[in-house]
Amino acid sequence: LVTEVRAVKHQGTRKYLLVDAGFNTLARPVMYGAYHPMSLCPADVGPTSPARSGLREEVAVGGPLCESGDIFTQTDGGFVATRDLPAAAVGDLLVIEIAGAYGFVMASNYNSKPLPAEVLVDGGKARLVRARQTPEDLFRGETV
């Protein structure tokens, strides 16, 4: 699951990366504390990029949904955990790895959020296997 960092926030002593994907796209961490490795792809690769500083930070990762449980870094029981990641900035891409198999089939349109595209990576090659849902797809089949 490839997400974009939309905000970097501090709450008390904890730092949060807020991304544009929520538990509606990957429910496993919220449902039972499933662990997914994460990696960062910096948008800015220049010499002043935070990711190139070598600095690493303990961060919690959350989504945009209006639910306190919209946290990708939680343990079984719903406790917020952190991950050691390179320093991130708004616009960087955060990859939540090993999200395949159950990612799409457990996804929902909660909060009227369209589902993301699905990409299969095999042998170092990526290909689109399901297109991103459009607003038209989201409301298809509804009548007023």
What are these regions (language model features)?
Residues L1-V144:
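Charged (often Lys/Glu-rich) extended helix/loop segments that serve as interaction or gating elements
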